[in-house]
A protein has these predicted regions:
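Hydrophobic packing residues within well-ordered alpha-helices of enzyme cores
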Residues: 26, 55, 92, 116-120, ...
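Short, acidic loop-to-helix structural element flanking the phosphoryl-transfer center
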Residues: 3, 80-107, 113, 117
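Metal-dependent phosphoesterase signature
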Residues: 58-94
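Active-site neighborhood of HAD-like aspartate-dependent phosphohydrolases
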Residues: 1-44
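Structured helix-beta-strand junction loops
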Residues: 49, 101-102, 135
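Substrate-recognition "cap/lid" segment bordering the active-site pocket of phosphatases
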Residues: 85, 112-149
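Short alpha-helical
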Residues: 21, 50, 114-115
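Helix-loop "lid/cap" segments that line or gate small-molecule binding pockets
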Residues: 29-30, 50-64, 119
Length: 149
């Protein structure tokens, strides 16, 4: 059967609620560098933003680019251990499962390919998607629309 169109969804906060997963992973990573992170602060000011934009203020305002990357790399290591606290959007999963035979499916995220794939694998839906677009696949991350174009 020929597919009729494309459905593109965001991963974090749309397909899967990953706020707690990311907050805990960043909290642990930052803690190992001597910094603290509160869940409410993360949810209000960091969630959905690219890590380079929000880690600098959390790391004293002027950390080296290398230290920012070290924190992010450590966060990616903690991510898998925290996936059990993620919650899938049950209604959206039902819709996508019903439409996948007739539509191409894409998931778009500002997250890393590693974390996106781990999360989709955790919910047994990686193979649903014809395209997984991550931060490494675009020049301009969300909120720029590049990933959707």
């Amino acid at each position: 059967m020929k597919k009729q169109g494309l459905i593109a969804v965001d991963l974090d906060g749309t397909l899967i609620d990953t706020v707690a997963v990311n907050a805990e992973s960043y909290r642990r990573a930052l803690e190992s560098f001597g910094f603290t992170l509160d869940y409410d602060y993360y949810a209000a000011y960091c969630n959905g933003r690219h890590y380079r934009a929000f880690l600098q203020p959390l790391m004293g305002g002027n950390p080296s680019a290398e230290d920012v990357e070290r924190v992010h790399d450590l966060k990616k290591q903690y991510y898998a251990a925290n996936m059990d606290i993620a919650r899938k959007n049950e209604a959206l999963f039902v819709i996508l499962e019903a439409l996948r035979p007739t539509h191409y499916l894409a998931v778009i995220t500002t997250g890393s390919r590693q974390n996106a794939t781990e999360m989709l694998d955790h919910f047994h839906c990686t193979d649903w998607f014809d395209l997984i677009l991550t931060q490494g696949d675009v020049v301009n991350n969300k909120p720029d629309p590049e990933g959707y174009l």
